[in-house]
Structures are given as C-alpha cells and as structure tokens.
A protein has these predicted regions:
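Interdomain hinge/linker segments and adjacent boundary elements that couple functional modules
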Residues: 1-38
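PLD/PLD-like phosphodiesterase catalytic module centered on the HKD motif
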Residues: 1-4, 14-15, 37-145
C-alpha cells in the first residue's frame, strides 16, 4: 500500500502532525469530533482552520452542539460549515490526502493516528459523508437550545 500510518503519543509531535495536516489540506477538510473538542478547535489550532479557509479549502465540521460548547460552535461557523449529530463519539479529520484520529484524556489529545494510505483516507471520507447526511444544520440545532 502506498502511504504510511503513524501513531504519535508525544504532545509536541501530535500538535506538529495536526498543523501539518492543516497545511496539507488543499480542497477538503472534514472533521467529526465529540462535544468537548470544539474548544480545542478554536484554541490551539484555530489559525490552521482560518488559513485553510483563505486557501479555498471546503471545511465541514460535525459535532454534538450543546449548551456547554455553543460559544465555541458559533466561532467555528466563521470558518466551517457546521452540523450537529446527537451523541457523536471519537475525533477524526480527513482531507484530500490524509486522515487523523485522536484519543483524548481530559482536554488533551494523548494519541494521534495519522495516515496517508489512500484506501484508509477514502474509507474515512465515506464515513464522514454518511455522518454528514445524518446530521442537521447547526442553525437548526442552535434554535433548539
């Protein structure tokens, strides 16, 4: 198989890999994260989202929108098309050529899997697109809160 898959556990290496993923996104960037990760997305890695949007990358973001993360989600709407999915678990993102998946402990990512294996990237893109169809627009969910 072409490409490689790496498992990272060092916090600095994880952040570096996320930034590389952000910089490498060319056309699409799809993220599906649990309700606690939007704070991370508008904190340590927000610049990468904003830069990708400026490059014309289509960013789609799925999370469970709650009262606790509502302010973060409103900020995410400035750089991504945001949708809500009840009970979403896990954290992954997929772009044109890469896939990343993180494991959290509290507010920190403690493990990150990063892959450029084309078959895995395509598989994760299809999973995201299936979840996207099942999710509802953020504005609809925010009206319920």
């Amino acid at each position: 198989l072409a490409g490689e898959t790496r498992v990272l556990t060092d916090e600095k290496e994880i952040l570096k890999a996320i930034i590389e993923f952000q910089e490498n996104a060319r056309q699409i960037w799809y993220a599906c994260v649990d309700s606690t990760l939007p704070s991370f997305s508008v904190g340590r890695v927000k610049e990468g989202y904003v830069a990708a949007k400026k490059r014309g990358v289509k960013i789609r973001y799925i999370t469970e929108i709650t009262k606790d993360n509502l302010m973060y989600c409103m900020e995410i709407m400035n750089f991504a098309e945001l949708r809500h999915l009840d009970g979403v678990k896990g954290n992954f993102a997929v772009s044109d050529s890469e896939y990343v998946s993180g494991v959290k402990d509290g507010d920190s990512l403690v493990t990150l899997v990063k892959s450029t294996v084309e078959e895995l990237v395509q598989q994760q893109r299809l999973i995201f697109e299936t979840l996207w169809i099942q999710s509802v627009p953020a504005s609809e969910r925010m009206g319920e809160i």
